[in-house]
Amino acid sequence: MKEPAHFVRRGLFNVLNGNISYDGSNVPVYNAVPNNATYPYIIIYSVSTNQIEDNISNYIADVSTRIEVVTRFADGDGGQLQANQIINSISQLVILKSGLMNLNSDGFNVYSQVNEGITYLTEDAPDHTYYRGIISLSVKLEQI
C-alpha cells in the first residue's frame, strides 16, 4: 500500500489555500510555519494512517489529519471568535458528504471526510494570548 498522508495534506492545502479569508484578508495555509508568519494562519499536519479494511483487491485506509487555526492578540485584546469564525469557514470546505477531495491522480479514491471533533485552546504567553482551533479530520480512502 502507498502511504497516503502527504497526498491528503496536499489535497487539503489545495482546497483551503486562497479560499479562507478573515476581515477581507487571505488567511495563509502552511504545512510548516515560517518564522515571519502573520496571524491568523492555518497549519495542516498528519497524525496517523491506519489500514481499516483488508480485502482481496483493495487497500483501504483512514488518514487522521489536523487542521489548526492559530490567532494571536495582545493581552486583553481579542478572543476566540476569530478562531471560531475561521474554523467555520474551513468546515464548510472540508467536512462534506459530496464533492470530496479528488486524489485520483495520486492513486486514491476518497470516500469519506468526517469531523472527529473540534478543539479550542487558549495559551497565555507573557506578551500575547494565542487562540487555537483544531479540526481533527478523518479521511477514508482506497488505493486504486
Place the predicted regions along the sequence by residue.
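Charged, amphipathic alpha-helical segments and their flanking helix caps
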Residues: 1-27, 47-144
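Short acidic low-complexity segments
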Residues: 29-38
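A short, hydrophobic beta-strand-centered structural micro-motif
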Residues: 38-48
